[in-house]
């Protein structure tokens, strides 16, 4: 995480960035609050119980609160994205 209440006292939101190498995927997570992200490089998909949704560089993503999701890099270059939450730290998150 780049911006949290620890790095910017008084902040009400948080900001971070992630890099996913080709062929990698996160585990399924669900956040207590919504998440927004912007894809700076690469291509991949958000995987949910409803199925995959592809994304590529230049696209913005919105993940509603409580939605189980994973991020997968389906391309041949790193996926780089910035993400944010309306929470002063990384929000309460469940994993499965």
Predicted regions and their residues:
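A short glycine-rich, His/Asp/Glu-containing loop-to-beta-strand
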Residues: 1-28, 84-86
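Double-stranded beta-helix
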Residues: 10-14, 70-96
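Hydrophobic/aromatic beta-strand elements that line small-molecule binding cavities or substrate pockets
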Residues: 16-18, 59, 69
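Short, conserved beta-strand element in jelly-roll/cupin
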Residues: 17-22, 30-46
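Short beta-strand His + acidic residue motifs that chelate non-heme Fe in jelly-roll/DSBH
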Residues: 26-28, 46-47, 63, 69-75
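A generic "binding-loop/recognition-motif" signal
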Residues: 32, 51, 67-68, 77
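Short acidic-glycine-tyrosine-enriched beta hairpin
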Residues: 50-65
